Each structure stands twice: as C-alpha cells, then as structure tokens.
C-alpha cells in the first residue's frame, strides 16, 4: 500500500488471513429479560469465548477473558452479573446481589454505564468517582446494584469507609476488573494490594465475590490475573470472534542529515509521515483512524492532513478531524456519527482512546510510533475492520532504538505472543502503606498475612519499628491519627507527589511522581498532561508544586541526568563464559543537570539550558553485566574506547528493554563504566526508576539473552555512521551523548553474548 515514490520506507508487509466466528447458544441459566435486551440489539447468539467465560463466572470460578479488540468481552461478564442482580432481589426490589466494576479510567467507567443503560434493564447502576456528590454517594451505598468505580476510589474512599458500605459489600457477588493488562509496574503493584484489601473487607462483611477480569490478548493471562488478585484464576484466551483480512505495514521515515546532536542524522518526524499517510488513504476513499501520542500531535496531524488534502482537491480539505479526551459526550458521538456516515474520512486520536472508542467500519489504522506494548499495538490495529471486513494497519516508526528494532525485526512484533504484565506486589515500598491501610480498616491478624504475600511479616516488623503499627495481643493496630490510606498514592512511584498548578487560575491540573518531577516538571519543561501541552514556569521542591500554563510551543524538551550507582546486594547471578550477568539491589544517585529543546516537527536540537536541582538517592533493583579485562583484550578495543563502547551499549539496552518488560524507557535508567569499584570490571547497569523496583530490571535479567541480542542487532543494523537517536543516542543522557562508540558497542556485546546462555526458557 506504499504511496507512489515511497516504497523505500516500507520495511515489512504482511497479510493476515480472515478468521470466521465460532458461535455458541445462550446459556439456559441466563435471565430471559437480559437475553431479550441483547437480542433486541441484534445479538442473536454468543461467540464461544463469551459463553465459556460467562459459564465459568456463573459457576463461581475466578476467570480472566483475554481476547482481541471488538471480541465482546463486556457481554461475557455482564451476562452473569446482570442475571445475578435480577434473580437475587428480595421483596420490593431489595438489593440481593451486588457487582463492583473497576476501570483504570473514569471515562471508561462512564462508557460502561452508557452501555448498560442502553440495554434498558431495571438495574440500579451508579458511578462512584471523585465527581460524585455526597447525595449520590449515599444513594449508591444504600441502593445501587452495579457500582462503577476505579482503583483510586476503592483505595481512598470505599475501603477506608467500608463500614458505611457494609450492606453493599455484604451483597457483593462479582468484582469485574476491566482492561486488566493496564495494571503494570508500580501502579499494578498498588492495585494488586488494593484488591487484596478488598477481598479481606468483603470477607469481614460476609461476602466472597467471584473475580472476572477482562484483558487484551496477553501472555500467560492466568498467571498475570493470579498475581493481580492473589487468587487461582481460570483463563479463556481462544478468541472466537470473526476477523477480516488484515494487511500490516511497518514504515520507517527517512533520515534527515545533520539535525541532531554532534551533527548526527535524525529521522523525519513520525507525525509528519502519519499526516502524509492519512492524506494518501483518504484520497483513495479509505476511512482511516490514526493513533498519535499527544493531543498536540493529534491536532497537528489533523490540520496538516487537511492542508495536504486541500492541495489535492478543495472538496477534501475538511474530511479529517481530531478525536481526543476532553470532548463532551455529545461531541464524541457527533464525531463518531460523522465517521460512520462518511462525512469524515479520517480521524487522528490520542492513544488513550484505545480504551472505549466506539467507531466501527474503519478501513485503516495508522499508528504514529510504537505504543509501548504488543498488546496495545494489536488493540489499536484491531480498530480497523471491526465489522469483519478487510483492513490495513500501518506502524510508523519514531526515531528511537525500540521502533527502529521492530520495523527491522518484524517477528519481534508480529511473530511473538503479547507480553505478560510486569509488576511486583511484594515491593516493600508498596506493601508497607497497604498493610497500614488494612490495619486501620480492621486490625491485622496473623492468619491474614499470607493474603498480602511472602514479605508481609518482614515489612510488618519494619512498620512496628517505625511506630506506625503496634502489636497488641494477637493483632497489629494502626496507631497514627492520619488516614492510613493517604500514605499511598497508587499512581505514584513513591514520595509525596508534586502538584501541577495552572499559573493563571491556581487550578490543580494533576500530579506527577516525586521521582519523575525533576526530569519532567523542571522549569522550562514542556509537560504533556492527558495529551495537552503545558510549559512549566517554576518547580518548588519544598512545597511540592510545579506552576505551569497551557502552551502552543513548537518544541519538546528532554532532561539531562547524571547518575552514579553502588551495589547493595547481589540477589542472583549467572556466568556467561568469563562474563557475568547479575540482578540485585542497588543505590542510585541521580541529578538532573540540564535540558534540551528540540523542534517538534523535525527533532532537530535547538539548544541546551543548565538546571540547578539537588541530587536524589534511590534504593532500587538493577540488572548488570560485567566483562573482565582478559575478554576485553580479545575484542581489540583500546582502553580509551571502552567508556564509549559501554556507554553506547547502555543507551541502546535501555531503549530496548521496554520490548521485554512492558515499561517505558523513562521508567528505567542506566550507568556504564569501564571500571566499577564494586565489581573491579567493565560494568553496565540498567536499573528501575522506582523505589524498591517495579519488576522491570528483573525481567531484563530473565530475558537477558534476547534483550541484549536485540540491543546488539539494533546498533549493528542502523544505517548511520557514528550513532544517532535510532540506535545509541539517548534524549536524557546527562553527559551530552559523549563518549559514544557505535562500532565498539557491537564488539563489546559480541564478546558478552559469545559466552551467553539463556537465563529463562
């Protein structure tokens, strides 16, 4: 499908065949009124995976449904849930069975409310979120049968106030965890502990609910769901929904000479290529949806596409629009209707709309930059051909090592199962606050500790020593006057979060983790919040406040950070010939020293500005590898070349780890040195950016052969001469991307991998 004159940008083209549906009958146990409501909306039968998941939930088995986009996952849990609600009612409609629905975003919970309301059933549905009034909350507690909320409200409101919710919690029959693949990293660890607290509080009120999890396709769904809930979970993962033929294209923008640091080439911006592709497709009357990472990017792509279309045919000049969060429901519905009717032929949308967007009949999807996981990639591509027709999916690579690797190694994207979620619910920095919250909800008993994992007893001792909990008789009690739930911000990596304040109004726009504020919310930073672009004026670390205002800036910023590291404890290691790979606990010292401004259109570096921010210390997990002097001698690398070779290997390995650990490159960091004092050898570290670790470095250790092999291949295959952002240059390097030795990095990694064996089957 390459446009005329640009076939050289297509790195891979693959055709996936169509798949027919496998149907199943409605179960006899289903409430006839619920079945009739679905039949009235054209659903005459189920797909096989819907029936299997619904039957498992009805039988009281905890189940995870892990299937593709548009495979009808909501019906699979709504059928048993709504049936239980209706058949469990007492006299005069008294609540007999309750359902709790958890979504990662408020918007998705509201979309779920709309979907249930459209069935026209007499089920009492309510949302419980930060916008709910006191009167609404009281009605929800006393009357609602199907409560839609999010993990944040469960943690801060419902669980601490569980005694006020006793009648509802005592009636709870089902807990639905939607979009479960989004719970990863530190957020996933927090949610895992919140769900354990929920199970404990439900038992206190006499309920033992069945958990039903819905997820995009992912590896080992029963393992991930079990780690999230602490329960034994049955997986339904065979997708029986129909799929049309899908053409997939991996697209790489061309290099532009001399626009980067030290004269390095940079690639044309993915957003510019995306606008060109939308134009090409719309001219051919192909209905197209483009996923773009930010609202600013969405608006830019839509505007540029219309400009290009106007040059081709003035009648096409307004056939592309933008679709992003923040629109009113009626605006969203109007845009959806315009796309369905054909008035609009193209739309640019933020990645967040992979959750809950209701647009069918699309012919093509263009993804501007790899969305971070194979699960998200397939979910976005799945938006095309949703009615079962044939479709086109295009991934446009951004200028970084991960995107570069994927378009040159298509099997890594298209030939592997999607990732399992990575998170560590036993992280003591996460577990501690939740043990405190649990003790305030109800004093902790010794026989309850296994619920919270193998480190609970150890962490409890630390909490007692810190004076936060007190052991009396056979239980642990919360001793502080504060609300224990306030100790944990479940979307934060640790420490008091920094509030983001709009300077002109004083309005709180959001928060950012204390750990990331230095690098993302410093003075002069361009900050993207829910897709909107803001310019930070000041960062006050004492008051934990960053003041910023909306911006139309045409540049982006990236912080430069200096890092040092020491090994606290080596937990595990493996010999790779004479080299070694290790995993353990480290102490990382970091200081943001400056930031770069880059053109948003071209990626060209505009300037660098120094910053005066304090050093931070972080105890976290890391993976590291060492190469002894005798092996280095055989590589032929001169001593003066070793720092640049190690530095280049470190940068690219950080860029590639997200392919194996479902993280963002900003969630991790690294250090490299030709001689580290703790090992006495050349050492390269990659560490988690969160206190206590988030599981990313450990995943790197477990998949090191594949991860570091991909690192080596990315550097070797890049067409630049000395290094560029697609291979070894890092946007956050505190040393100004010096020294870097591209050829030396390949030789160094060859020496390491020559002795390597797989660390995980």
Regions found by a protein language model. Name each.
Residues 718, 723-727:
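Short cysteine clusters
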């Amino acid at each position: 499908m390459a446009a005329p004159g640009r076939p050289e940008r297509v790195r891979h083209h693959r055709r996936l065949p169509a798949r027919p549906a496998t149907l199943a009958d409605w179960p006899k146990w289903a409430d006839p009124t619920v079945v009739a409501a679905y039949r009235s909306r054209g659903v005459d039968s189920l797909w096989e995976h819907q029936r299997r998941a619904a039957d498992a939930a009805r039988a009281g088995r905890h189940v995870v449904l892990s299937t593709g986009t548009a495979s009808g996952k909501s019906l699979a849990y709504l059928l048993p849930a709504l049936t239980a609600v209706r058949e469990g009612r007492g006299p005069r409609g008294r609540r007999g069975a309750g359902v709790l629905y958890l979504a990662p975003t408020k918007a998705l919970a509201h979309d779920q409310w709309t979907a249930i309301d459209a069935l026209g059933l007499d089920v009492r549905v309510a949302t419980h979120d930060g916008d709910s009034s006191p009167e609404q909350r009281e009605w929800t507690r006393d009357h609602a049968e199907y409560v839609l909320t999010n993990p944040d409200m469960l943690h801060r409101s419902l669980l601490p106030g569980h005694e006020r919710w006793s009648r509802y919690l005592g009636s709870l029959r089902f807990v639905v965890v939607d979009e479960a693949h989004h719970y990863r990293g530190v957020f996933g660890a927090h949610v895992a502990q919140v769900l354990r607290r929920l199970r404990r509080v439900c038992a206190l009120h006499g309920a033992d609910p069945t958990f039903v999890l819905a997820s995009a396709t992912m590896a080992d769904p029963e393992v991930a769901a079990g780690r999230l809930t602490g329960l034994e979970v049955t997986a339904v993962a065979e997708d029986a929904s129909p799929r049309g033929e899908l053409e997939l294209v991996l697209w790489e923008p061309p290099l532009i000479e001399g626009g980067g640091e030290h004269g390095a080439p940079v690639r044309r911006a993915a957003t510019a290529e995306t606008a060109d592709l939308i134009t090409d497709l719309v001219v051919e009357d192909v209905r197209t949806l483009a996923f773009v990472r930010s609202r600013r990017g969405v608006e830019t792509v839509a505007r540029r596409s219309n400009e290009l279309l106007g040059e081709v045919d003035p009648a096409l000049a307004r056939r592309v629009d933008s679709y992003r969060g923040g629109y009113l429901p009626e605006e969203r519905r109007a845009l959806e209707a315009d796309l369905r009717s054909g008035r609009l032929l193209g739309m640019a949308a933020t990645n967040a709309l992979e959750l809950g967007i209701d647009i069918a009949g699309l012919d093509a999807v263009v993804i501007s930059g790899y969305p971070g996981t194979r699960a998200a990639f397939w979910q976005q591509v799945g938006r095309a051909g949703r009615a079962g027709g044939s479709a086109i999916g295009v991934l446009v690579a951004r200028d970084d090592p991960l995107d570069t690797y994927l378009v040159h190694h298509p099997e890594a994207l298209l030939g592997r199962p999607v990732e399992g979620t990575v998170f560590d619910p036993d992280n003591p920095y996460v577990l501690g606050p939740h043990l405190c919250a649990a003790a305030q909800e109800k004093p902790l008993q010794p026989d309850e500790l296994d619920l919270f994992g193998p480190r609970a007893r150890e962490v409890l001792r630390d909490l007692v020593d810190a004076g936060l909990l007190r052991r009396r008789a056979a239980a642990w009690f919360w001793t502080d006057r504060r609300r224990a739930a306030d100790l944990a911000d479940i979307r934060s990596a640790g420490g008091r979060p920094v509030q983001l304040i709009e300077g002109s109004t004083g309005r709180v726009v959001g928060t950012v983790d204390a750990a990331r504020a230095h690098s993302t919310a410093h003075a002069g930073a361009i900050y993207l919040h829910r897709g909107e672009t803001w310019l930070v004026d000041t960062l006050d670390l004492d008051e934990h406040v960053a003041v910023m205002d909306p911006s139309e800036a045409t540049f982006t910023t990236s912080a430069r950070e200096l890092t040092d590291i020491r090994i606290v404890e080596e937990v595990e290691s493996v010999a790779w010939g004479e080299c070694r790979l290790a995993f353990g606990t480290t102490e990382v010292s970091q200081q943001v020293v400056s930031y770069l401004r880059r053109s948003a259109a071209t990626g060209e570096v505009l300037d660098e500005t120094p910053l005066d921010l304090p050093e931070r210390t972080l105890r976290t997990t890391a993976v590291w590898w060492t190469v002894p002097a005798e092996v280095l001698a055989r590589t032929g690398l001169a001593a003066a070349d070793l720092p640049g070779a190690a530095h280049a290997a470190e940068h690219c390995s950080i860029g590639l780890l997200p392919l194996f650990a479902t993280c963002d490159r900003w969630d991790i960091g690294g250090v490299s040195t030709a001689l580290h004092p703790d090992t006495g050898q050349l050492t390269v570290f990659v560490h988690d950016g969160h206190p206590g670790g988030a599981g990313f470095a450990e995943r790197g250790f477990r998949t090191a052969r594949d991860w570091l092999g991909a690192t080596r291949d990315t550097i070797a295959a890049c067409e630049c001469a000395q290094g560029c952002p697609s291979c070894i240059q890092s946007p956050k390097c505190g040393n100004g991307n010096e020294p870097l030795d591209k050829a030396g990095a390949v030789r160094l990694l060859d020496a390491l991998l020559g002795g390597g064996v797989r660390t995980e089957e």
